[in-house]
């Protein structure tokens, strides 16, 4: 048979024949022979190499022998005519015969390779040397091809399709590569029940992201391996299909369908031996479809799913199931829903205990049980936008990774000692060079004295550094040895399980009572050695993940301070009133109420289902309501801008409430989220200020009812936003006229309070007021408070001048004048700010521009008549340079 008709060959086989001509020319051969075709075939990565490798044949060795043989053949001048050799003719005839035997439509690579085994020119000798015959190679080809026939010119993509596009979960379970699945017995039993049906035996696992849907499929694989399943599932293979690999590289129309059909063909021809698992099931809807055709993966699956020819487990989230699967009623009815709920905190703790060994071995650390309990409880309480057990597992994983990173780096104490030694060594070298210079007696003696002191310090520090280094190294080596023993112990346990599954009880007993016991004794001895070393000289390396490590990770994720209180912070919380009073003058009731709420929260005494505190500040304008919120933000976060401020005057219309929680679906801005909800999602631990609440439309307060009572709100996209770690402050000017009228008379304080509360009750609904922790009255400011506020305001001016290296001092008369000009009981402290700006800042700005005062001056501000005067004085207050009036 002459190689002249490409339509009789598959694409890859014809490609090998075409390339063989280049090989023949490379070896200056006159005839195209079998060795040239085989060299071309084996140089390319493909089915030829796979068949040889699966038959335990070294491809490189075969290729080298073929090339050596080709070099020994007669050579002709370059450019000579190339003819088809008799051996190639015979090879193609034999390949064609094999094709007919297999009922294939095209000559493929495997036909050429099997025909080459009987090649009299070189093939027979080569395979005899390898001790391999055609039957062995044919068995390998059959294992790769399965039930597939060569029906088109690109059949290689369909061979071992499941191996290419799937992952065998049962094999992974047999090798111990899957994490143990703890609990979930009811859900796994329900999946087995659906799989055991005659038709529509396809469960779909539906649940929120991170609740363990994929883990249930892995748990089923482990049960199949252990034989803990009904007869209908015993010895079955559970294969996870990777749709991404199926679609990737499918350039031409029909490629994807061919690949999927090959997978389904393998599954159906396994006669129920294969159960398919499709993670992210919603991706089958629309996968592989194009503009001109609605044929996608789901439409190829439907007939087989309905007839029960294909047993398939799907997994998807609730949202994606509703969005994709429910819309296709024909696909939905072929699957039986199995709802996977979020496990409880107790179940999560059990899951973490089951996974503990895997994470300890991976990170080379120990994880305490209290850390596992803390991970489950803290993640449930503080990480509200994710689900158990996923978020708890992530916490443990990250805390262990952080500790491992600390173990692999040098201790800070040792590093500091090494830095000091390097510094001393450099100084010693410098002084040695200086000593050799021609110096007078006094400097030379000083250099020698300094050199002597440095050498004495080096002699003192070096042994300490060496001892510390040796101890750290010994501790590190012991930890590494412990981890190595644990890994080996894990492997031995896996081998014992495998031997027990295979009923090789003799091997299982040898491992269990021989190697395993030896390893456990060695592990105990090494751990005792480590404890002894740590007890003798203290520990450098902390190898245990504790509750505090978990709390630190949660704090980093959420911004909520959960770590144990440091002494400095403890003191700060006890003195929070004094800290707040540095900025807020007077208003003791308000400051005390806010400080008490913060202390309750940090001491762990707050109601876990409500915000830290919710307050309604009522009082006249300019008395410090907004300032207290800013001062609190600065006290908690060291930044007064860490304040979520919502100006309620922007919510005067009824529809403006959508800006707070997000626009409803179909409206512009739906994807942007709400001003309030997005701010708290990003920063769950915050001070939230609703300024001037009475300016908002009454309907807006309905949104806040759930926030105040349950500490949560649902935004326009259905996400629950957690307000349990926020301080909510609302300010209002309602009833301020009663405060101003009766503030001077202390005996009528209760009457004033009742009148203000009546004003609030007239405006706010009872269900709103009833949810607030405390309604706090802010008093009007007197001259004494205003004088203190003036000093705070003047410190700001002093700071601005200090940047220009100019100092500012005011006489008591000047200060009294500013307070008198700025005093207005109706408007509070704001007129004082304007008075300071008008009387002090404006004239000063002019003098600075005129260069009357220069850097280094101290400006004394005094009152002469009814005007402020400015003059430069020496720091001691004498040596006047000039006096300048404000006018």
UniProtKB/Swiss-Prot annotation:
SMART domains hit by this protein: AAA (SM00382), ClpB_D2-small (SM01086)
NBD1: region residues: 160-342
Region (Linker): 343-559
Residue segments, region Repeat 1: 9-73
Binding, ATP 1: 207-214
Segments for region (C-terminal): 781-887
The keyword Transferase belongs to this UniProt entry's keyword annotation: no
One annotated GO molecular function: ATP hydrolysis activity
Chain intervals for the UniProt region annotation (Repeat 2): 84-147
InterPro entries cross-referenced by the UniProt entry: AAA+_ATPase, ATPase_AAA_core, Chaperonin_ClpB, Clp_ATPase_C, Clp_N_dom_sf, Clp_R_dom, ClpA/B, ClpA/B_CS1
Record's subcellular location: Cytoplasm
Protein name as catalogued: Chaperone protein ClpB 2
The Clp R domain, residue ranges: 6-147
Region called NBD2, residue ranges: 569-780
Comment, domains: The Clp repeat (R) domain probably functions as a substrate-discriminating domain, recruiting aggregated proteins to the ClpB hexamer and/or stabilizing bound proteins. The NBD2 domain is responsible for oligomerization, whereas the NBD1 domain stabilizes the hexamer probably in an ATP-dependent manner. The movement of the coiled-coil domain is essential for ClpB ability to rescue proteins from an aggregated state, probably by pulling apart large aggregated proteins, which are bound between the coiled-coils motifs of adjacent ClpB subunits in the functional hexamer.
Gene Ontology cellular component terms for the protein in this record: cytoplasm
SUPFAM superfamilies associated with the record: Double Clp-N motif, P-loop containing nucleoside triphosphate hydrolases
Similarity comment: family membership: Belongs to the ClpA/ClpB family.
Superkingdom: Bacteria
Keywords noted in UniProt: ATP-binding, Chaperone, Coiled coil, Cytoplasm, Nucleotide-binding, Repeat, Stress response
Subunit structure, as described in the record: Homohexamer. The oligomerization is ATP-dependent.
């Amino acid at each position: 048979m002459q190689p002249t008709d490409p339509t009789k060959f598959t694409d890859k086989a014809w490609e090998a024949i075409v390339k063989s001509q280049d090989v023949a020319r490379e070896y200056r051969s006159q005839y195209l022979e079998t060795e040239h075709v085989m060299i071309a075939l084996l140089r390319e990565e493909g089915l030829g190499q796979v068949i040889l490798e699966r038959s335990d044949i070294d491809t490189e060795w075969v290729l080298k022998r073929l090339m050596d043989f080709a070099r020994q053949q007669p050579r002709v001048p370059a450019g000579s005519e190339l003819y088809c050799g008799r051996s190639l003719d015979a090879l193609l005839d034999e390949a064609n015969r094999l094709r007919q035997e297999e009922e294939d439509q095209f000559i493929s690579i495997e036909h050429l390779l099997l025909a080459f085994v009987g090649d009299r020119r070189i093939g027979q000798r080569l395979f005899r040397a390898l001790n391999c015959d055609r039957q062995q190679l044919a068995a390998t080809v059959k294992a790769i091809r399965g039930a597939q026939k060569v029906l088109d010119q690109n059949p290689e993509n369909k061979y071992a399709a499941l191996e290419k596009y799937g992952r065998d979960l049962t094999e992974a379970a047999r090798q111990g590569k899957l994490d143990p699945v703890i609990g979930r017995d009811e859900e796994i039993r329900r999946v087995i029940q659906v799989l055991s049906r005659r038709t529509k035996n396809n469960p779909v696992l539906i649940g929120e992201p991170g609740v363990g849907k994929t883990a249930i499929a892995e748990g089923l694989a482990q049960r199949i391996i252990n034989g803990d399943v009904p007869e209908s599932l015993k010895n079955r293979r559970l294969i996870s299909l990777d749709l991404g690999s199926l679609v990737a590289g499918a350039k031409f129309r029909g490629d994807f369908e061919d690949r999927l059909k090959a997978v389904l063909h393998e599954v159906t021809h396994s006669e129920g031996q294969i159960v398919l698992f499709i993670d992210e099931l919603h991706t089958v809807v629309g996968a592989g479809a194009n503009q001109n055709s609605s044929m996608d993966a789901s439409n190829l699956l439907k007939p087989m799913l309905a007839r029960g020819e294909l047993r398939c487990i799907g997994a998807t989230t609730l949202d994606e199931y509703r969005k994709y699967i429910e819309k296709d009623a024909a696909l939905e009815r072929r699957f039986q829903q199995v709802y996977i709920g979020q496990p409880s905190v107790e179940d999560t703790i059990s899951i973490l205990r089951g996974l503990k060994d895997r994470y300890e071995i991976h990170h080379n650390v120990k994880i305490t049980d209290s850390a596992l309990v803390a991970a489950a409880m803290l993640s449930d309480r503080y990480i509200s936008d994710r689900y158990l057990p996923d978020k708890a597992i992530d916490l443990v994983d990250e805390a262990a990774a952080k500790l491992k990173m600390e173990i692999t780096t040098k201790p800070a104490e040792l590093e500091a000692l090494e830095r000091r030694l390097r510094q001393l060594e450099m100084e010693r070298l410098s002084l040695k060079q200086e000593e050799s210079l021609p110096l007078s007696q006094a400097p030379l003696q000083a250099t020698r004295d300094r050199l002597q002191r440095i050498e004495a310090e080096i002699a003192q520090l070096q042994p300490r550094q060496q001892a510390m280094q040796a101890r750290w190294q010994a501790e590190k080596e012991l930890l590494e040895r412990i981890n190595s023993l644990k890994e080996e112990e894990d492997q031995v346990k896996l081998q014992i399980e495998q031997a027990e599954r295979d009923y090789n009880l003799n091997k299982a007993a040898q491992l269990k009572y021989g190697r395993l016991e030896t390893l456990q004794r060695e592990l105990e001895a090494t751990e005792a050695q480590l404890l002894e070393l740590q007890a003798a000289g203290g520990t450098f390396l902390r190898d245990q993940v504790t509750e505090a490590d978990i709390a630190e990770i949660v704090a980093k994720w959420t911004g909520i301070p959960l770590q144990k209180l440091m002494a400095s912070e403890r003191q700060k919380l006890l003195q929070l009133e004094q800290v707040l009073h540095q900025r807020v003058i007077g208003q003791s009731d308000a400051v005390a109420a806010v400080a008490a709420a913060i202390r309750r929260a940090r001491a762990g005494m707050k109601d876990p289902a409500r915000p830290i505190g919710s307050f309604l500040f009522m009082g006249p304008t300019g008395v410090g309501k907004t300032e207290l919120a800013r001062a609190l933000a600065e006290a908690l976060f060291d930044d007064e801008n860490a304040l979520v401020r919502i100006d309620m005057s922007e919510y005067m219309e009824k529809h403006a409430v959508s800006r707070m929680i997000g626009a409803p679906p179909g409206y512009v801005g739906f994807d942007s989220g709400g001003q309030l909800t997005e701010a708290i999602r990003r920063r769950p631990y915050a001070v939230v200020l609703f300024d001037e609440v009475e300016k908002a439309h009454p309907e807006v307060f309905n949104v806040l009812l759930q926030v105040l009572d349950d500490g949560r709100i649902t935004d326009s996209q259905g996400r629950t936003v957690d307000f349990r770690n926020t301080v909510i402050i609302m300010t209002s000017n309602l009833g301020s006229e009663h405060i101003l009228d009766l503030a001077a008379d202390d005996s009528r304080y209760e009457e004033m309070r009742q009148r203000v509360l009546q004003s609030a009750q007239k405006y706010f609904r009872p269900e709103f007021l009833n949810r607030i922790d405390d309604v706090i009255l802010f008093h009007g400011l007197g001259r004494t408070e205003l004088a203190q506020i003036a000093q705070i305001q003047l410190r700001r001016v002093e700071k601005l001048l200090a940047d220009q290296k100019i100092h500012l001092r005011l006489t008591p008369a000047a200060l009294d004048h500013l307070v008198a000009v700025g005093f207005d009981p109706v408007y509070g402290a704001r007129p004082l700010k304007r008075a300071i700006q008008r009387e002090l800042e404006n004239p000063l700005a002019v003098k600075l521009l005129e260069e009357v005062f220069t850097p280094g001056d101290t400006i004394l501000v005094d009152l002469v008549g009814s005007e402020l005067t400015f003059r430069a004085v020496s720091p001691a207050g004498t040596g006047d340079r000039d006096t300048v009036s404000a006018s």
